[in-house]
């Protein structure tokens, strides 16, 4: 299957050249596979700098943009930049010129532009950022981790359905289980919205819903899908990443290599904007090196698996 991936070189915490070099590393690692190609989106200045500084004979195509979305741009400001690298990349995705689009840039802008340009599944009220995290039993899926700060119980139900569809379409669990991220395991814990969500999830999924789950229990692997609002989910994810970075810093070489591989969040692909009819991947703004390499590689695998089409089919 031929796969063409688009990537925004602009807007992240690192220089566009850092992202470009990782892109070339991915290309070289898959040199024997002629069915994979890339299109990069960057400002004219960055494109000229790349073409004058690198001698790679088989460059990915670079589409020059008039502007780019900065990390501190509001969603409205991003929409007004109609010829930004992010907007052009999403236009290419909308027009089926690429099979997936990756960005390390402004999350709110990416979500807003994606919703404006890419159709949402008919049964989905709001897309959610979906990630995989390592657990003692393999990995779990958690959503939302930052697309929606405030959501209602019906939207949380939609997240659960998308997470279930994602797990099923990738064949990760025959009978996936669901948990609601909360401040305690008791049914009455949390806000009124959490209590309503608990009741809806229980009525909908019955035995597959195992109730509330505390953040510290996620890594035990007690559930396959963790449902959260974007505010709580984002704090959980960034705390988990910070703890791993802290352990790696203080333990260094004392951390066994197999343990490191199991705990290392950088081996997992970036966050999928789940609920869109086409594949959009948000990598961490500070992603570089291995984490970005794996984010790009994971996007290739998801595109090949036609994950969006399979999730839509499962939801239908």
Curated annotation (Swiss-Prot):
Major localisation: cytoplasm
UniProt record, GO biological process: fatty acid biosynthetic process; phospholipid biosynthetic process
Pathway: Lipid metabolism; phospholipid metabolism
Keyword Lipid biosynthesis in record: yes
Subcellular location: Cytoplasm
UniProt GO cellular component terms: cytoplasm
Top-tier EC class: transferase
Record keywords: Cytoplasm, Lipid biosynthesis, Lipid metabolism, Phospholipid biosynthesis, Phospholipid metabolism, Transferase
Catalytic function, reaction form: a fatty acyl-[ACP] + phosphate = an acyl phosphate + holo-[ACP]
E.C. numbers: 2.3.1.274
SUPFAM superfamilies (UniProt xref): Isocitrate/Isopropylmalate dehydrogenase-like
Molecular function terms, GO-annotated: phosphate:acyl-[acyl carrier protein] acyltransferase activity
Subunit structure: Homodimer. Probably interacts with PlsY.
Function: Catalyzes the reversible formation of acyl-phosphate (acyl-PO(4)) from acyl-[acyl-carrier-protein] (acyl-ACP). This enzyme utilizes acyl-ACP as fatty acyl donor, but not acyl-CoA.
Family: Belongs to the PlsX family.
Protein name as it appears in the record: Phosphate acyltransferase
């Amino acid at each position: 299957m031929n796969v063409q991936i688009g990537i925004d070189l602009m807007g992240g915490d690192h220089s566009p050249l850092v992202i470009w070099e990782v892109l070339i590393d991915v290309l070289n690692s898959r040199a024997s596979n002629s069915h994979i190609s890339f299109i990069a989106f960057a400002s004219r200045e960055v494109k000229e700098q790349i073409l004058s500084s690198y001698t790679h004979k088989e460059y990915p195509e670079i589409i020059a943009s008039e502007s780019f979305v900065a990390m501190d741009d509001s969603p409205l400001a991003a929409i007004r930049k109609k010829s930004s690298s992010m907007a052009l990349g999403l236009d290419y995705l909308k027009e089926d010129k690429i099979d997936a689009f990756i960005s390390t840039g402004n999350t709110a802008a990416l979500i807003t532009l994606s919703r404006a340009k890419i159709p949402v599944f008919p049964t989905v009220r709001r897309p959610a950022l979906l990630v995989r995290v390592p657990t003692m039993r393999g990995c779990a899926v958690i959503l939302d981790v930052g697309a929606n700060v405030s959501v209602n119980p019906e939207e949380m139900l939609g997240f659960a359905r998308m997470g279930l569809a994602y797990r099923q379409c990738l064949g990760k669990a025959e009978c996936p289980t669901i948990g609601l991220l909360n401040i305690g395991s008791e049914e009455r814990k949390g806000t009124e919205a959490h209590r309503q969500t608990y009741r809806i999830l229980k009525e909908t999924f019955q035995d597959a819903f195992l109730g509330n789950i505390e953040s510290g229990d996620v890594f035990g692997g007690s559930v396959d899908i963790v449902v959260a609002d974007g505010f709580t989910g984002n704090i959980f994810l960034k705390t988990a990443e910070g703890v791993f970075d802290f352990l790696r810093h203080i333990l260094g070489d004392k951390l066994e290599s197999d343990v490191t591989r199991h705990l290392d969040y950088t081996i997992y692909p970036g966050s999928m904007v789940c609920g869109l009819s086409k594949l959009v991947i948000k990598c961490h703004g500070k992603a570089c090196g291995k984490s970005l390499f794996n984010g790009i590689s994971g996007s290739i695998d998801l595109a090949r698996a036609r994950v969006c089409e399979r999730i839509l089919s499962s939801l239908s």
